[in-house]
Amino acid sequence: AFHKRREDERADAFALVEALDYLAAQQVRIVNLSLAGPPNQALAGQIRRMDQAGIVLVAAAGNGGPAAKPAFPAAYPQVIAVTAVDRRAQVYRRANRGEHIDLAAPGVDVWTAASIRGARTKTGTSFATPFVTAAAALLMQREPGLTPAEVRARLLSSARDLGKAGHDEVFGHGLLSPPDPCS
């Protein structure tokens, strides 16, 4: 988490690019982006540079609804785009859709830390994204030499298909099936 510089709680694209540049300089191997917004040239460039540097990027698909335009950074091709499903593997009704969706993960009524009091349930693609980030981190811990493309391929190939057979605009390749942390 990064401190905010203004009273406004939202970050602009410049602040996001600056934060991602900082993370790249720290040589992180994976970044969770539980946020979504419009396309931005500077952000697209930073995402490309991080991918080329071997950094895995996982982002929330967005909560604009089925008819919403693709949200970024999830819609950039170098990013693993995550949608949210409930306990019955039904897509979150406000989740964005599109060809760029890669995986589905739990994101409805997720018990999470709250800024005011301890913890509470929250819903959205931002709450599904950390599940995929954690699964990617497990893969990378086991096999440190994996490239971002290889991490993506492993996660997508192990997903449990939901919805229409194969990749679709609602669930992507399907429900995340994380690697066993004990094997």
Describe every region a protein language model picked out.
Residues 1-38, 159-165:
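Subtilisin-like peptidase catalytic core
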Residues 2-5, 93, 107-175:
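Hydrolase catalytic cores
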Residues 9-16, 32-102, 109-133:
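Substrate-binding/specificity loop regions of serine endopeptidase catalytic domains
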Residues 16, 22, 30, 171-183:
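C-terminal domain-closing interface element
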Residues 18, 84, 137, 153-157, ...:
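Generic alpha-helical structural context detector
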Residues 21-26, 87, 138-145:
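Flexible, small-residue-rich helix->loop connector segments that border functional cores
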Residues 61, 77, 114, 155, ...:
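Hydrophobic aliphatic residues
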